[in-house]
Each structure stands twice: as structure tokens, then as C-alpha cells.
A protein has these predicted regions:
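Extreme N-terminal, non-catalytic leader segments
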Residues: 1-5
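ATP-dependent small-molecule kinase phosphotransfer cores
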Residues: 32-125
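ATP-binding Walker
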Residues: 14-15
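Hydrophobic anchor at the beta1->P-loop junction of P-loop NTPases
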Residues: 7-9
């Protein structure tokens, strides 16, 4: 089914990923569809608010979050990603199933869901699995310091967790990436150097489209 190109960009907190994605959108223009998770479609954005902004979200365990993320992802796929790919667009998602694995399976410690995760991935994605994952790697100490220095309001309940959580998160991403086509970018570099590396990876991927 897939006519376009599907790329996921993911990272822990404070990598500068969102800034780099905005630069990509500006550089590559209208043929690039930039979306995000959780969210990316009207109903999935409502689930995003439930996941990140609900007053009681911090009380939800990994199993609850796991279900909510996959529900949002199903709607996101149907209403945003699939139509764009059918139209031959390049879709870049700011987070995707890689985050579910890193956050819920590893950092939140729900290893009992690991086999189920891969089953869910096969069931929901089928032939829609991303062509490439780009992981912005950064030491959590540096990333969290950046996040705190940026200001921009209160941290969500994931961002506000202790450093051990974020160290586990980094390990979770590395573990997931071993299973999929991926590129790693050193996000601790200066912004323009990160952009140069990111642009090079995107141009290489687009040349194969």
C-alpha cells in the first residue's frame, strides 16, 4: 500500500528534536507531513491530553499508558499517516511506537508486556512499519538540564521523573533500535551540527524514495 516514505524521529527529553523537526519542515517544504505522538489526529490529540495533562495521569501505571498510546496510534494511523502515504507524501512522526517501548516496557518496567508489544506492532502496523527511525541520542543529565533551562511551563509527569527513569529510557531506545532500520544522531552537539547530520540522513532517505 505504501507509496510515500514513513520516518520516525525519537529521543529522550531535551534532545532538541522538535526544533530540528521544525527546521526540516521549513527546509523540505510541502511534500513533508510533520506529525506527532501521542496525537497527530483530532481524536488522538484528545487522548494526548488524557495521557499528559489529566490531573490524575501520574497515577496511571504502565499497562494503562500502554493501552492509551496504542489507541491513539490506531487513530493517528487511520486518519493522518495512511492518507498521507497514499498521496505519496513523506511522513515524519515526532515519536511513535519506539517511545511506547522505551517508556512503558523499559523505563516503567512493564517487561511482561514486551511480547505483547511486538504482537500489537504487527497487528496495527502490518505493512505500515516505518522505513527509518532516527534516534537523537543525548545523556539524560544534559537533556534534562536543557529542558529545565528552556522554561516553557510545567514539566509533564514523564519529564519530571527522577534521573534513573531517564537513564532507563535511553537504554530502552537503544534496545528498540536494534530491531529496526535506524540512524543515530549525537544530539549533544551544537544545534547547527545536529541539523547538518539530520539533514544528511533525511536527504539520503529521500533520494531512495
Amino acid at each position: 500500500m505504501k507509496k510515500g516514505l514513513f520516518i520516525v524521529v525519537d529521543s529522550g527529553e531535551g534532545s532538541g528534536k522538535t526544533l530540528q523537526l521544525n527546521k526540516a519542515k521549513e527546509f523540505f517544504g510541502k511534500d513533508l507531513v510533520l506529525t506527532r505522538e501521542p496525537g497527530g489526529s483530532p481524536y488522538a490529540e484528545e487522548i494526548r491530553n488524557l495521557i499528559l495533562k489529566s490531573a490524575n495521569a501520574h497515577q496511571a501505571d504502565a499497562k494503562t499508558m500502554f493501552g492509551l498510546f496504542w489507541a491513539a496510534r490506531a487513530d493517528h494511523l487511520k486518519n493522518t499517516i495512511v492518507p498521507a502515504l497514499k498521496a505519496g507524501k513523506v511522513v515524519i512522526s515526532d515519536r511513535f511506537d519506539s517511545s511506547t517501548f522505551a517508556y512503558q516496557i523499559v523505563a516503567q518496567g512493564a517487561r511482561e508486556l514486551e511480547t505483547f508489544f511486538w504482537q500489537m506492532r504487527d497487528f496495527y502496523l502490518k505493512d505500515l512499519k516505518p522505513d527509518l527511525y532516527i534516534y537523537f541520542d543525548i545523556d539524560p543529565v544534559i537533556g534534562l538540564a536543557r529542558k529545565n533551562n528552556q522554561g516553557g511551563g510545567e514539566l509533564n509527569h514523564f519529564e519530571a521523573r527522577q534521573i534513573d527513569f531517564h537513564n532507563q529510557l535511553r537504554e530502552g531506545y537503544k534496545e528498540f533500535m536494534a530491531h529496526v532500520p535506524h540512524e543515530v544522531i549525537d544530539a549533544s552537539q551544537p544545534i547547527e551540527k545536529v541539523w547538518g547530520d539530520f539533514k544528511k540522513v533525511l536527504e539520503k532517505s529521500l533520494s531512495k524514495k
